[in-house]
Amino acid sequence: MRWFKRRKPSAPRQEAVHVTLDEVKRAVLQYEQDMQEQIPRTTLLRPDQSIDLSRLKRYLGGISDQRFYMSRMTYEIFEEQDMHIPLSLDVVQAAVDDYLDHHDDLPVIPGTRNRQVHYDKLIERHYLKEKPSIPLYLTTEQFMLTHEPDWTGRLH
């Protein structure tokens, strides 16, 4: 009878690679291009909206120990310190979409050049439960939201 089990040799552990936000964005786009048409990039997301970087290791040159987060609705990608932004984008985007289905006007603060979303109007009409901690803006591109206040100069 053996008291001790023989240890299995462990696979050599690879060192984590450091990647930039731009590298992750390029890797996600390349992943989506390489996949079959019916497989969207949101399949890379975990329940907490972090990106499963192990599935991007062939595009990144290894597995990163960093965390990046993506909005399910706008596909914007963020670093860990901005992990609250994708959730806000998704909640408010759903509220804006529902609002636009029932109203002809835009839920933006009147007079703002960058079309800042009017949270009070969305809350008052029961499309949003609470105000996000950051301002969001309604773009002209399919009425998608962004967190960038200067989005108007980037679309042209």
Language-model regions: role of each:
Residues M1-H156:
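Short acidic linear motifs
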